[in-house]
């Protein structure tokens, strides 16, 4: 808790998780920019049981992508345990925490309305500001949640924020820096099984065919 003008303010903690996942897109960004971290996620609990970002929806393949939940013991995080990562804490008011969580949950519940901002990501690394409604890349997603909830004042527009920028913000406190395998929260988790990427693509294809057929047969 903190005191302001004689009043007690209840504080809560948001968690910012930075990684360089080693995927094709991550490696491309790393080679072009040299950025230590190429992906960012947001968590509301210290155990990091659920992370939120705009990323691959099935945890493995690049597409489909958009606002999604991530898990440290599944998907890419399961396959690449030696990737570099960093965990930061951000102290916010109870009201800002609630607004951030409500906004994030709304986007998760209405995921069909949102898309991954591929062009915006490219322009971001070129330092060109470009906004497209309901389209987000990872750092844009986290930045808008934090900014619009009043949790954090950004040094630049959300469409220009890079994951590595968060490692330089004075408001954030570093809790861990190292490999994913050494992260205490992940060490306490039961690891899942690695799924076949081919099987995932087939499921995505079958899902798309089913949706298309449903739309065609509806009266």
Language-model regions: role of each:
Residues 19-89, 123-127:
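Glycine-rich catalytic cores of cysteine/serine-nucleophile enzymes that process amide/ester linkages
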Residues 1-10:
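Short, Lys/Arg-enriched N-terminal segments with co-localized hydrophobic residues
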Residues 11-35, 166, 178-209:
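Donor-binding and catalytic core of enzymes assembling or modifying cell-surface/extracellular glycoconjugates
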Residues 25-32, 79-159:
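Active-site nucleophile-His-acid catalytic modules used for acyl/amide transfer and hydrolysis
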């Amino acid at each position: 808790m903190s005191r302001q003008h004689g009043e007690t303010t209840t504080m809560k903690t948001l968690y910012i998780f930075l990684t360089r996942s080693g995927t094709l897109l991550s490696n491309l960004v790393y080679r072009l920019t040299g950025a230590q971290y190429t992906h960012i996620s947001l968590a509301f609990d210290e155990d990091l049981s659920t992370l939120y970002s705009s990323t691959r929806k099935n945890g493995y393949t690049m597409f489909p992508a958009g606002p999604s939940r991530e898990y440290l013991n599944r998907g890419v995080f399961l396959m690449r345990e030696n990737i570099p990562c960093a965990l930061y804490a951000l102290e916010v008011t109870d009201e800002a925490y609630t607004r951030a969580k409500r906004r994030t949950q709304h986007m998760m519940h209405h995921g069909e309305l949102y898309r991954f901002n591929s062009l915006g990501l490219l322009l971001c690394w070129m330092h060109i500001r470009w906004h497209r409604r309901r389209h987000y890349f990872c750092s844009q997603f986290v930045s808008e949640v934090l900014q619009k909830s009043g949790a954090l004042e950004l040094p630049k527009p959300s469409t220009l924020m890079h994951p590595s920028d968060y490692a330089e913000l004075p408001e954030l406190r570093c809790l861990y820096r190292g490999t994913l395998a050494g992260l205490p929260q992940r060490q306490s988790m039961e690891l899942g099984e690695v799924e076949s990427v081919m099987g995932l693509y087939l499921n995505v294809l079958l899902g798309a065919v089913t949706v298309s057929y449903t739309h065609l047969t509806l009266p």
